[in-house]
Amino acid sequence: MAIEVPTRVTQAPEPLRLVQRFVNTADVEAGLDDLADAAGARRWLRENRLLARGDSLDEAGRELLVDVRETLRRLARANQEASVDAAALRALNEHAARAPLRVELGPGSAELATASTGVQGAIAQLLAIVFTAARDGTWRRLKACRNDACEWVFYDASRNRTGTWCSMAVCGNRHKVRAFRARRSASVA
């Protein structure tokens, strides 16, 4: 069963939305994971057209996917602070070095395309999207909710790029209530 991202989570524009969906294959709050086993990972990749029917995916491939996902989540967390997670960036660059990508030129266009199939091809497609988003400035808007119990990755559509929560009405409100209670208990003590 695929994880349903709450409708409150602002969706990134295509094709970055695919990367957002990939990172959101783990529901931190509910403890669910679409990539928990090879069959689930295969199903998710096929549903999202990242893995052909004939391509296989073993446990090592699943572990690689989870590592890429969690590296992207760490970078989305760093986007909250407009900082750099150097270790996550190094890890992503290591994955990118193994990603079989090629440049495809068209009339008035150029894009990165995968030069492989299977799990490495799927990772290459995701990293090509990250590359394009980093170039056009949309990557910095992909953020992980600051609520550690949530961590849905959302697209910060605010004009000044200061979005903090996947939803102000849910996670932002929870934070405000906790802060209020902490202030109140501190004043009572």
Where are these regions (language model features)?
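Short helix-coil boundary/hinge micro-motifs
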Residues: 1-144, 151, 188-189
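Basic DNA-binding region of bZIP-type proteins
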Residues: 169-187
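Aromatic side chains
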Residues: 22, 154-155, 180
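Residue-level signal for short amphipathic helical patches enriched in basic/charged
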Residues: 137-140, 157, 172
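Residues immediately within or flanking Cys/His clusters that coordinate Zn2+
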Residues: 142-147, 163, 168, 174
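Short acidic, gly/pro-rich beta-turn/loop elements at beta-sheet edges
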Residues: 33, 155, 176
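Short linker/helix segments within small regulatory modules
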Residues: 156-163
